[in-house]
């Protein structure tokens, strides 16, 4: 059984076949391995599509029909005769995530705790009871907040807990935990507390105490109520109610609470649960206020949209696009390290393509990937940011199982996560490929500045991206020459030595760039001969490498390798 959610329609595919046509929908939820995927508007070009036997292949079947332009609000899907070999394999994973939420009303929502989580909650309840009995303090109430609640409702694992306290600072409460455990003689939980000070200038408004309890990382922070006086920085931070705190958070699905004392999920914005159910990214307050409080939340909206394949609501998009002050604040107020952390999470997430799609189409490309000062730029022009989106989409297709059917070499499907990360990072930096700037009198590629300074990635990342971007023309030329006349052993060996151990990723990135002119035909790849011919060139080149046993020639000592090449040329 496969449940496909289309607005309020649940389509169940089972039995021998089902005939449904022209369904209008805004999103489809497909669940596999505890991850929800939302596939926005697409059109089946063919009259029918067979559902493959492997759930992972089903995901690819759906994803391949996503449009290569900006995702539209509503699309049309035509389902013809659908094979049913999936059977009960997939149904064992349902309901998950948002589909699971469809079966629960807000009042009935419960969270099932793991053994570790139960132990943590028991300790925290004991600490509050201890404080009530021994300290002259207001009643202490504890709630787990934010991402843990969201992930538990989506049935994901989460090992980081944020505990919100109504009447104490995080550090005060953490010290009381230590006091209580020492008094109880609990040798299994030796609490070490680290306090992260607030930094309002960088939008870090609250002091946070971090510790590890029962093997789980826990942050303690007080519920907040911020008071502003015509400034982006709060003039005072007061203890707030859970409702005050919920409305100060980034998005509604992160503003849910789990009350440790009652065991209930609390939705004070009245939208968190419904947005989680409907797959929407929305700010609790008007988005201009939420973003001015912390402009990094713009990127967090994008990250969570791409992580869960959710839709950012239109009023939030409009503010991001039209309010230039938000972009200025994101560029000037937020540390580049924080920006880089968000970008890294997007690249490592389930859909780096949707992430860069949103960055580009919300007009944030040169804000996030900001270039050096204009006076330092000496040559070249910024290519349209759409090119990085095009290459990212081509990479996604080349890396997918679907491309195996179109003579894309299998070596590209064996790349590890770090290699894929480098490929997408190179795609993100592509618009700066032909630009140079001067630093200390030395001319350098602008993309090096962007990676090293704008998003604060490592020098290793800079070197990897330099290799991928600088080798595009060389690889395309070498592969084309081999297609006309087979490259001899010496020439091919020197090529692999030049590309080093990264030669598979370098070839794949060059291939993705060579396919750019054919991009508009990518949804018709099966019928397009030119795309097949380009793929064939690279497959032929790789097969030549393996035929001559040169796939690891880069690791051989240079002198010995040169002699071998000379003897066999």
Q: What is each of the regions a protein language model found here?
A:
Residues 2-569:
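Catalytic cores of the polymerase beta-like nucleotidyltransferase superfamily
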